[in-house]
Amino acid sequence: MQLKRPNPPLQLGLMAASCALLGSTAAQAQTVADKALPWQVETALLYYKENAGLLQTIEPIVNLKKDFGDQRVVDGTFILDTMSGASPNGAIPSRKPQTFASPSSTSLTPRAGAKTKLYTITPGNLPEDPHFKEQRAAGDLDWSQPIGIDSNLSYGGHLSTEHDFNSAAVNAAVSHDFNNKNTTLSAGFNEEYDQIHARGGNPVPATDYTLYEKEGNQTKNVAGVLVGVTQVMSRNWLAQLNYSYDRSQGYLTDPYRILSVVDASGAEMGYRYESRPDSRVRQSLYLGNKVALGPAVLDLSYRRGKDDWGVNSDTVDTHLRIDVARDMYLEPHVRWYRQSAADFYHLYVNQADPLPTDMSADPRLAAFTGTTIGVKFGVKVAHSGELSLRLEEYQQKPTDRSSPLTELQGLDLNPGIKGTIVQIGWRQEF
């Protein structure tokens, strides 16, 4: 369930609703929106693969959008992705072979009638479950319309299901234009409900890995709000400022993550299931800009995020769309991300220390920097059609990768991630 990388933000539905409103008001202040438009269909096939034979994802996407006139718009998206490959389980490399069981197993000791699938990691290698495979189906449906003069309402829902995780969410947002439609204020909310039913059962947090103590299905709730302002700065410049706040409560632990327990020398002495707090508050401030630069359009944004787990982050994202011919464009893309580690993040747990109440070795909670560099090429074909190809490289570099303990010296405890993204897209109106 939570082994997939990267996970979408929990407030994605809220962001989509609010941004859609912002874009349909200030960004369209000088357009006529009372005329019905054709159906717009966008399809894409995304392929993501991590180096060294880790996770790979194949994801077809279909989006349908229809403007019925008078700014009454329906927008629906369907995603079906398949993930497979090897996924790190949270333990660190060791000088000796290590044996683990896949999550659906019931024991580390094979015996008659037992549902057990074991895998052994050779010395010096990062423990990864080679049996990881998951399919996810997700859909979003949103509707937006005017409410009174210079105001808009948007609302929608989201459903997602996979073998061990189900999610349902609703969102709504309102916006109002003023200052001759050069300024738009927006506010919205999002409510999400998730069910977690891990393969083999949800482990009791912080318990001994070898005991296989499991409990029933778990749930979590996420509630969020967003407020924003969009301003037409000039004929060529549109700026947007958003503040978001969301609170998660319930089962926030990853049921498939463990931690290594080591002695004073760094030798492996066992494993513990991870344990996370049962609540999390996250806040972010976003500043976005779209600037027309002759035959090019610059999209530059900065986001500052923080939460009560101690994870503080900075994101700079830039796209530059360049018209290289009448019917062709190039769009270079650079994204830089940095975050601090969660307060309870540990590469491993020392046997001599008191067992922490909260602990996780999930690399997504570690301190790291991530960089995405790529380019998108698009060409108009046929009548109102467009074909596009996107190529990107992603690299994640952890800050903490080594240990001074004797048995762990020279081992790469958190090697990071390198991945390639290829996406082919098609857009057509009819």
Please provide the spans of the model-predicted regions:
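Membrane-embedded beta-strand positions of outer-membrane beta-barrel proteins
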Residues: 41-43, 76-78, 155, 185-189, ...
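Extracellular loop and loop/strand-boundary signature of outer-membrane beta-barrel proteins
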Residues: 47-50, 125-129, 156-160, 171-175, ...
